């Protein structure tokens, strides 16, 4: 054996590391069920599991001076493996989400609300980036090694979660000399989850005291419809190849093709390699969308007889991938590497939470009448954590998901990706020439934010304009 004996630690390192991550989530779940304030905090189990491991690793480092996850029992390079798991969790999770069959069609009004949700998502990224850049531009004159463009990580850590925060932190660290960039990104994402959990609970309690909402006291378990697991014309659950194995194979095949595209483009243009591999989830989404359309066409022409993709199982794959991404990302944080940035990080975290809260509150009040609070909790949770956090907060005010907010979250991904893509390009441009390019990026974000909000509030803006023109016409006629 080239790897040594089966009892050697390097054979078991990855298994023990993954087992530790999963065990931390089991412990976190037990603590949430047993401790009242944790149960009421709405903190996701994966986040709590990551915090438990971060605390253990930090205490170990304080006592021994060594990195806990780099012990031989974890293979000797556990921190690097945690970052790899975080990176791949993002791509695999998005591919599985994209492969899910579309569940329903909507009328014109609902399509407009879904578009508005996507526009709100991207506008949320932009306002986070604007305030984040303003903060880090100022602190870059005071804090050593802090680059002015670091503030863009706020919109990725809060708006898109651990995976993208790590991606851009890594790009800034490797390509632009941002010392501790990866840990900076992971910490911003962790602060986002805390903002979602703590801020969400505070506002929930406030609205409940005012009598504006009714919070569900009991955890509701929704019965699984067997048609979700074994739909019409789908391949059998236990055929010659297990149905779950088929779903995993599809997801990983899409991811492999995505790697080929990233590798090819990165080899053709070496300067874009880090950017290409930072877009692993986006390229995965595009390849998955293409495959989904090909399968739909083949099924329509009766070339493929059965449905191979199952939405229920794809949900389970994406849920597992995102759980692993979150717990691994938080556990990978090395606090000593970001000690010099703590004041900056705390200010970014607090300002990010406040400005996201205010902006989403305004949008939901004016654009989502009839389910303002449901839409708010879904959007606030998503724009400070992930889609899963948004669903957790939404469940507190809409336990059965009867409002349109849950569908808005699911179907807003396409407009969010389309309108959000320029933001990713701006984020890679921002650090190129230090303060100058960062200021240009800030100006672009402000201009794009204004443009998107004109589009978002198009009905209100043009309705008022038409009303004013009508009044002017009436005055002229009366004269």
Q: What do these predicted ranges mean?
A:
Residues 1-11, 18, 206-245, 296-308, ...:
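Intrinsically disordered, low-complexity non-transmembrane regions of multi-pass membrane transporters
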Residues 35-42, 67-83, 100-119, 296-314, ...:
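Interfacial helix-loop-helix linkers and transmembrane-helix boundary segments
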Residues 101-133, 246, 251, 331-361, ...:
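Entry/N-cap segments of selected transmembrane alpha helices
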Residues 254-367:
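Transmembrane helical segments that form the transport core of multi-pass membrane transport proteins
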Residues 24, 51-58, 80-110, 287-296, ...:
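Hydrophobic transmembrane alpha-helices of secondary-active transporters
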Residues 325-329, 333-335, 345, 349-460:
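C-terminal transmembrane helix pair
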Residues 9-23, 79-93, 150-155, 277-287, ...:
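Structural signature of hydrophobic alpha-helical transmembrane segments
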Residues 123-127, 135, 143-178, 184, ...:
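Alpha-helical membrane segments and immediately flanking helix-loop junctions
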